[in-house]
Amino acid sequence: MLSISANEFKENLSALSLLDIRTPRERADFDLGGIHIPLDDLLTRIHELNISTKYTVICYNGTQSQIACRLLTAKGIQAQNVTGGLEAYLSLP
């Protein structure tokens, strides 16, 4: 599975195709933009994603986004996980 560090994510955020898989409540606390499909809905809404796009997937701590990346990859969609998730991103200086 591909991954990107929180620092690389911060430096390249505007150029990435972000897929935020956090719950609506979690996202309301801190919205990074991008596409929002909660992990629980990912399989039923996967058709909303472009198969030719590489997505950078984020959750709160990087655990659920690993699961999402595996699901996306199994469906032929390129995905990379943000290591440590939003928690790691927010801890950066």
Model-derived regions: residue spans:
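Rhodanese-like catalytic fold shared by cysteine-dependent sulfurtransferases
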Residues: M1-S17, I21-K54, T63-P93
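Short, surface-exposed ligand- or partner-binding patches at beta-edge/loop junctions that are enriched
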Residues: I58
